[in-house]
């Protein structure tokens, strides 16, 4: 069985690395961020009256 030359291994590694990086970059940029609606009920401030 013939063995692969070191340059072929390097070429194979570079191709897989480039494919992996492109996959990660596309997954990062393809998602559209969803807008979070601010509701005033979540931002209510609790006030405590202290009786000393």
UniProtKB/Swiss-Prot annotation:
It holds the Pfam family ATP-synt_8. The chain crosses the membrane at residues 6-26. GO terms for molecular function: proton transmembrane transporter activity. Keywords: ATP synthesis, CF(0), Hydrogen ion transport, Ion transport, Membrane, Mitochondrion, Transmembrane, Transmembrane helix, Transport. It is a single-pass membrane protein. It is found in: Mitochondrion membrane. One of its GO terms (biological process) is proton motive force-driven ATP synthesis. GO terms for cellular component: mitochondrial membrane; proton-transporting ATP synthase complex. Mitochondrial membrane ATP synthase (F(1)F(0) ATP synthase or Complex V) produces ATP from ADP in the presence of a proton gradient across the membrane which is generated by electron transport complexes of the respiratory chain. F-type ATPases consist of two structural domains, F(1) - containing the extramembraneous catalytic core and F(0) - containing the membrane proton channel, linked together by a central stalk and a peripheral stalk. During catalysis, ATP synthesis in the catalytic domain of F(1) is coupled via a rotary mechanism of the central stalk subunits to proton translocation. Belongs to the ATPase protein 8 family. F-type ATPases have 2 components, CF(1) - the catalytic core - and CF(0) - the membrane proton channel. This is ATP synthase protein 8. It comes from Penaeus monodon (Giant tiger prawn). The gene is MT-ATP8.
